[in-house]
From Swiss-Prot:
The keyword Transferase does not apply. This is Translation initiation factor IF-1. Pfam families: eIF-1a (PF01176). InterPro entries: NA-bd_OB-fold, RNA-binding_domain_S1_IF1, TIF_IF1.
Length: 72
């Protein structure tokens, strides 16, 4: 099975939601719901409102994503 192509977009966290999910506004003005990636949870990287992040999305559902990096 081939690995699916993931889309990566920079964005900004606008709201914290329950269960480690976040509302993220992408640079192209779209708003999505994103959760933190497993490695970020494992290393206890905190994500707060206003943080600049890198979001990974699948081309099949462009309303959900995964936060893979928090910019310093």
């Amino acid at each position: 099975m081939a690995k699916e192509e993931l889309l990566e977009f920079p964005g900004e966290v606008t709201e914290l939601l329950p269960n480690a999910t976040f509302r993220v506004k992408l640079e192209n003005e779209h708003e999505i719901i994103a959760h933190t990636a497993g490695k970020m949870r494992k290393n206890r990287i905190r994500v707060l409102a206003g943080d600049k992040v890198l979001v990974e999305m699948t081309p099949y559902d462009l309303t959900k994503g995964r936060i893979t990096y928090r910019f310093k």
